């Protein structure tokens, strides 16, 4: 999520803009290009960018000391908790004017370019009043990454249901001993890519809204508990790659690419992030949706 306490700098003179950026799997090249273009189009403004995979830990003491960056790009679900703290403290600037302003192409407002429902969600409008305080900084699918070559060579079908998912775990173990699943261990936030779709499938988007709003009892209902039971079954029945919980993101992703596990949760950035990582022969990235209860359920 991106949050920004900035307005237009068209008339700025000799001003400095301090920005703090999370460096994820997409790399830093596009951020460097944006900084260059911004400085070219805003004469007199110098952009000081701090970019790091651990940017939350870097800026937390600065924020506590009252030295808050002008612009922050950081995952709202990060283990550092920075974004959640800023939301709780009502420390974010209202961004309605940004999205009601003209889009880059000059064909309408920026709001018109955003997929319906995103800006109204609790991710962007955390106080439920319709006002936007956080903005999405990228858009792309997330799901189960797997090696298409391995599936094709062994005539394996991508599982659509949870029953098929666990049955596949038995098949791949028999083929070459690989586990069904791994995840980014010490960064369990990646598991939300499996958790939230599973809950939405069981009991709808309303359940996610209740959870996001910390409503009492939001987890204690049959549908949510059923979704959680599927994820628990991965560990309880031996489908999780041994050692997963102690790995970081690149370690677990490498293990999966080496053929130690059939699936890992991730997004489209993994291909770029792991471009130089070792892998099993013929490895080809592919992505599948999270399993559903029934094969004809809508994702």
Model-based region annotation:
Residues 121-137, 142, 166-216, 261:
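Extracytoplasmic/periplasmic solute-binding protein
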Residues 13-24, 45-50, 71, 133:
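Short, well-ordered beta-strand elements
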Residues 83-85, 194, 201-203, 229-299:
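Extracytoplasmic/periplasmic substrate-binding proteins
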Residues 62, 94-114, 201-226, 276-279, ...:
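Short, solvent-exposed loop/beta-turn-alpha elements that line the ligand-binding surface or hinge
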Residues 169-171, 213-245:
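Glycine-centered hinge/linker elements that transmit conformational signals in sensory
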Residues 80-141, 194, 286-288:
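Hinge/lid segment of periplasmic solute-binding proteins
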Residues 1-18, 40:
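Short, low-complexity disordered leader/linker segments with a strong preference
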Residues 25-46:
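Short, polar/charged alpha-helical segment
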């Amino acid at each position: 999520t991106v949050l920004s306490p900035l307005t237009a700098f068209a008339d700025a003179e000799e001003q400095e803009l301090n920005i703090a950026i999370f460096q994820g799997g997409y790399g830093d090249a596009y951020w460097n290009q944006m900084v260059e273009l911004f400085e070219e189009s805003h004469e007199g403004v110098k952009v000081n960018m701090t970019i790091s995979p651990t940017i939350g830990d870097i800026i937390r003491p600065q924020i506590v000391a009252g030295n808050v960056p002008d612009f922050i790009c950081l995952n709202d679900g990060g283990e550092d908790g920075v974004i959640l703290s800023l939301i709780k403290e009502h420390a974010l600037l209202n961004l309605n004017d940004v999205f009601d302003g003209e889009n880059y192409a000059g064909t309408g407002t920026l709001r018109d370019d955003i997929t319906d429902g995103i800006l109204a969600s609790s991710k962007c409008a955390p106080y439920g009043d319709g006002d936007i305080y956080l903005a999405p900084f990228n858009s792309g699918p997330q799901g189960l990454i797997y090696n298409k070559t391995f599936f094709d060579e062994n005539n394996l079908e991508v599982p659509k249901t949870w029953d098929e998912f666990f049955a596949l775990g038995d098949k791949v173990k028999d083929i070459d001993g690989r586990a069904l699943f791994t995840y980014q261990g010490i960064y369990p936030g990646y598991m939300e890519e499996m958790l939230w779709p599973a809950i939405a499938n069981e009991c709808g988007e309303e359940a996610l809204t209740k959870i996001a709003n910390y409503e009492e009892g939001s987890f204690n209902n049959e549908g949510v508990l059923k979704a959680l039971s599927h994820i628990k079954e991965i560990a309880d029945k031996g489908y999780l790659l041994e050692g997963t919980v102690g790995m970081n993101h690149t370690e677990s992703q490498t293990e999966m690419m080496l053929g130690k596990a059939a699936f890992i949760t991730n997004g489209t950035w993994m291909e770029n992030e792991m471009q130089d990582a070792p892998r099993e022969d013929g490895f080809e990235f592919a992505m599948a949706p999270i399993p559903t209860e029934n094969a004809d359920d809508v994702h």
